[in-house]
Each structure stands twice: as C-alpha cells, then as structure tokens.
Amino acid sequence: MSTKLCQRIARTATLSPTSLVPRSSRLIPIVSSAAVRPSSAIPTRRPFSTTESRYLANVQAGMDKIRDAIAENFGGPAHNIGTTSFSLDDTPDLSGKVAVITGGSEGIGYGVAYTLIKHNLSKLFILSRKREVFDGALASIASELGQDKADRVHWIQCNLEDWAQTAVVAEQIKKDTDRLDILVNNSGRGIMTAGLTSYGVDKHMATNHMGHVVLTSHLLPLLQKTAEETGETVRISNQSSNLHSAAPKGTQFKSLEEINEDVGPNGQYGRSKLAGILYARYFDREVTRKMEGSKGRVVMNATHPGFVSTKQSVKDIHEPYPISGFAISHLAEPFKKDQFEGAVPTVYAVTMANEGGQWICAPAKAEAGTDLAQSDELADNLMELTRKIISEKTWPKSVAKGCPMDDVVVHV
C-alpha cells in the first residue's frame, strides 16, 4: 500500500460525524428558530390607491373584452373562453312548446332546429325554399334523434322576398297550431351583390328584414295569446351580425331610394343586419313594454352567431368576390365556428333570455353594438319606412293605424 493512500485512510478515520454528511447537504445552512424574524416584523404591502385600483380594473375589463371578442367570433377552444357561459346542453326542456324557424334546414338554422327538437320541442315548423334540403335535414334528425322526434318537424315552403306568400304561410301556421312559443327569424341573404325583388326593393332588406317583419306581424297575435295563456315569456330572435358595423355611416332609413342604393356587398349585408338589431329595439318599446301587467310577455332580441362555416361563408361569398373570397371560404375555415357553435346565442335568446331589445353575442352576452345600432330615432325611421314600403307594395289597406308592429300586416 502506498504512503499517500495510508495517509488518506488515517485522515478519514479522524473525521467528525458532521463532516461525513454529503457535500450537497452541507451546503444547506441550518438556522435556529431564534434567528427567524417574528412575523410581526415582516413589512406588509400598502393597499392599492384609488388610481391603482382603477387602472387594474381597466386592465381586467380590457382583457375580458378580448376574451369575449374571441369567443363571440371563433370556433373550437376559442368558443369557450368568454366571460359568459351557456352551451347547447344547457337548453331547458321544451316539452309542450311550438317553434317556427326560417331557414331551419341548413347552417345555423339547422343547428337551432336540431337542438330544440333534441330538448323535447313538441312541434317545429321549418320555413325554407327547397324541399330537398329539408328532406336531408329531416333524415339527419331521424337518424340521430329518432323517428319520433323527426315526426314533430313540419316543412312549409316560404320565400321571404315574396311578402304576400309569406303572409299566406303565417296564416297557415295559425291554423295548424293553437300556440307559438318560439320564433326564429334566421333565414337571410348573405354577402352578395345588390339586386331588387319583384316589388322593386333591395333583396337584402326585403329578405333579411322586411320579410321577417311580415311573418312576425302575422304571427304576433298567436305569440301574444300564448304568452297570456301560459303566463310565460314567449321569445323571438332576429339573426344579425357584427357586420352590422359595415352599414353606411350615413344610414337614415328615410326612403326606398336610400335602401335601394348599391353600397357594395358588405354594405348591403351590414345594413340589413343593422335593421335586425333596430327591429328588436323597436319591438321592445312598442310591444314588450306595453304588455307589462299581462300574465306573460313577448320579447325580441337580435343575435350574432360569429364567424360560422355555412353555405354563405363557403360558397356564396364567391358570388361578389370570385378570387378574394377564397380567403374567407378556405384560408379562414380552420378558425370558423361549426353550425352548432353558431347556433348557441340564438338558442340562448329563444329559450333563456328574459329581457328584450338586446343584441346577444356568443355564448350569452348582450353587447351594445355600433352607435347606429343604439339609436331609437333610427329604429323609428326604419320601422316607419318598413310599414310604408310594405303597405304600398302589397295592399294599401294593410296598414291603417300607423307604426305599431301588429299593424304591419299584409292581408291575404
């Protein structure tokens, strides 16, 4: 054994126990409890000042707005990050209730129809143009929810551009049911080039707004009767959009010439979606509030479905934008909501909302909308112009007492 090795063994034998603790453990200092500062001596942070509290509240509010904007417009995980909570599974039981949905055979309308039937709606009238599209929707309902649920769904052909025919459809519904709890004004013309109906009225306004006014006005007595007899809230929704912001800034709704002016695909569409919000505001003032004291009441709200993958955003968008439309139809597709996510705010509006005159965004948040969308004066202009155009283009005697909604009726 070498001399150096013998010296190392001798040194090891004389080490104290603490020196045998592993090196890593010896690096941790052992502090006695007496050396710890009393908790009372630890300085506390002063309370936030009013200015600091206000700043932090503004930051939080700003973050909430961002979360809501994302949830309101995009699908997938983004759909669920908003500050409000509602899912299609939260839809209440609808046993005994009856609904009408325009455009309920496809897209968002189908998402709404499917959900209402799934939650035991007793009868559903779907109004649309093409029987073959409805047949496909009905087959899907039968396959997924059962034939019993499919047997509750009835189809009536309806072209909302044709107000006289729309009136006939509404009168037929009143013969086929003794109650109506839900009306979904969903069908509409998307972002497309300008055109005029046979009445000589802009197609966007004639379909998206005025056709639904005719339908709603004819059905209103039945809606009110249902509210009075059941003592419940009867609900109407108008399919609007955040693209109501694309309506011309100078919109006044003062004349037929104004709404027939070609303001571009986005402007045409945006103006008609602005009308849906204003209609809800007007209805709240002229119908809902006048029912106070009744057993039940009828409320109307407008909704924003978000950026949804539908025929409008995949196919129709190429009519006004043959090339650039691919950005919406294809590149943006991964970020869109599906038809069921797009249906969420409408389902909330027609099953849960108790207040009217709101613009409800996904999943269940009432937003203010643009300045134009908040103008009662503009709402009055819109509905007076609507009354005037419908009465002049269909039957002069159809409106005799002015502007209240129950007077905007095309007599068959």
Curated annotation (Swiss-Prot):
Induction: By blue light. It is found in: Mitochondrion. InterPro entries: NAD(P)-bd_dom_sf, SDR_fam. Residues 1-55 form a transit peptide. The keyword Transit peptide applies. Its EC number is 1.-.-.-. GO terms for molecular function: oxidoreductase activity. Keywords: Mitochondrion, NADP, Oxidoreductase, Transit peptide. Signal peptide: none annotated. The keyword Mitochondrion applies. It is an enzyme of class 1 (oxidoreductase). Its main location: mitochondrion. It comes from the Eukaryota. GO terms for cellular component: mitochondrion. The active site is at 269 (proton donor), 273 (lowers pka of active site tyr). NADP(+) binds at residues 108, 120, 186, 269, 273, 308, 310, 312. PANTHER family: OXIDOREDUCTASE BLI-4, MITOCHONDRIAL-RELATED (PTHR24320:SF33), RETINOL DEHYDROGENASE (PTHR24320). Belongs to the short-chain dehydrogenases/reductases (SDR) family. May play a role as an NAD-dependent dehydrogenase in the mitochondria. This is Putative oxidoreductase bli-4, mitochondrial. It comes from Neurospora crassa (strain ATCC 24698 / 74-OR23-1A / CBS 708.71 / DSM 1257 / FGSC 987). The lineage of its organism: Eukaryota, Fungi, Dikarya, Ascomycota, Pezizomycotina.
